[in-house]
Amino acid sequence: MNRKTTLRLLSMILILAFVLTGCSQPAPTPAPAPPAAPAPTTAPAPTAAPAPTAAPAAPAPTTAPAPTAAPAGAPASKYNDAPILAEQVKAGKLPPVGERLPQNPLVLYAPEIGQYGGVWHRGFLGPSDRNGLIRVVNDGLVRFSIDGASVEMKYAESVTPNATFTEWTIKLRKGSKWSDGQPFTADDIMFWYNDVVNNKDLMPSVPSWLLNKDGSKVKVEKVDDLSVKFTFGAAMTLFLPEIAQKDAGDKNYPMFLPAHYLKQFHASYANKADLDKLVADAKLKTWTELFYLRQDQFDNPDLPVMSAWMATNRYSEQIFTMRRNPYYVGVDKAGNQLPYMDEVQFKFFADAAALNLAAIAGELDEQERQISLANYPVLKEEEAKSGKYKIYLWSSTGGDEAGIIFNLTYKKDPELTAMWTQLDFRKAVSYAINRPEIQQSVFLGTGEPRMGIIKKGSPWYPGDEWAYKYTEFKPDEANALLDGLGYTKRDSEGYRLLPSGKRVGFELSAVPALGAYVDVAQLAVADLKKVGIWVDLQIRERDLHFQMREANDLQAEVWNQDSAGTMFSGSTKFDIRMPIYGNLTYGPLFKTWYDTGGKDGVEPPAPWKQIVTLQDEAKSAAPDRQAQIAQEIFKLWVDNLYDIGTVGLTAADQGVAVVNVKLHNVPESLTKDWALRTPGNGKPETWFFVK
């Protein structure tokens, strides 16, 4: 196989991995909401929201999926910088822009050449909402494209495989600098790998993507000051999408760190007495706690960063402000250093409802996170009336907006766990849910009742049978299944009883933010009551929900499935070995079993073991085999109802974008998902305000 053919194969892999939103399957036509189904908020819902705008399909590349090097920028003498930075240069506080940029800057193309200045006003719900900050900075060596169909260079100048995809070499841009002006080099990647990943105090277990099939560690070595080589025991065809989900904004998944700054907080480098004093002064117990605190760019404004904007204060404050990085590596095609906007300000709101009111009033310049689809009619009305903003609907790669997931390793009540580990019980729950009602009431008629798999048109799509399996509203079938399990006795309120006399039921945890989790949960609870299943709906804040998830304390949860298009890379929700924080609560102790080599935790059932085996095979598989593997996993997933999907293919989960009419270059069509770090894949450093 020659080099060109090999790279074509890699391109195909990426196209398979990220479903193009312009697939042949059109979005379902929204049906009008029935009068009897009230909107989940007090806002009127006179019309159904249109389906999300599909992003155009990207043609398959003829060579590599992303350019091995970015196009050359303007000559150094022709670079321009923002007026506020030019003033600092004039005052002798900053070097000229040509000296701050790398020799070969990242060149970003957008519909318009922008204007400098302005503050991007956004909202957030405080520290528990930090993923919204991570998405904006999208602080990685590479990143996903606007349509999610490919991976593009960012801080890296090139990422190159060998002919067998067992070696990948990352080359950085010569002359790149951290926000404090210090060089950004291969040593910053090596510090992350040698001193964080391989330090058991900081990271007890090595991330699975850095392990070979036999459990040995992937070899990571410095080639020169700008290059680092990763060597795998077998072909690693998913390296690009994997590292696209490793960004320094996410303290759990960085891939580079400012060694020159963080060494003072690391036990391998710092003087012990000095480090002990720093720990004591911070009122912490260990150096590892201090290290993680100082590594967090949203909680430590002194941390040097590579992102377009850098923190000026802590994100626990009422207004969290990020200011332009004078050393950012990007320019536009005219040689203007990016970003265009001077600042990003995140205003704290006590809840999502208050944030939505601010968006409706036109107080936020671009906001998709926490925006409720239920408010779409009001937003459209205000869009026409005030003329302050435009509303875009961004699409996803598939999945579902709010599924019900049972914890199959819950320990506190074995009788309850035994009940919901029965597949027939989960089938009964699924058949009892009236998805068409949820579609109309919660999602304004958009999307479709479905399971959380990839959307039609992808080579990974296993077929309609699995997209819609168990999604029919069949309360009679649900009752028959429950009767067949022996739950025939009922109490005075009509709830079925277990042999012990306890009610057949479970506690369901839902977070009142991001998507429509609570609205969906409330309707599902009412449906399940009709077949005799008692549900204790607990509405919890995100931090507490996640703490309980990690502690194996959740019985069941409502969450979305947003990794259908990136099943084999990043913190995919289709692999129980992923960190529990970012995964779903199928069985936290299954992960423990894998982490300890079977010495602790709970041994997974055969289907889960099969999924794990398939996941491992996919990392080195050819494109056609990857498609087969994806289909096999989706089938196992649905057949066993590990995630009971409700409705998918809507803009509900961070796809309703409110955009100031004066803010230009914001993509009207954008593929959104957590893996893509939306809106970060929309290149926000190119967005600008028209004066």
Residue ranges and their predicted role:
Residues E157-M203, K229-T231, L355-A358, M419-T421, ...:
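Aromatic- and charge-enriched surface segment that lines or borders ligand/interaction sites
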Residues K200-V206, V220-E221, M310-R323, K347-P414, ...:
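Extracellular/periplasmic solute-recognition and catalytic clefts
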Residues S208-L290, V666:
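Surface-exposed binding/hinge segments that line
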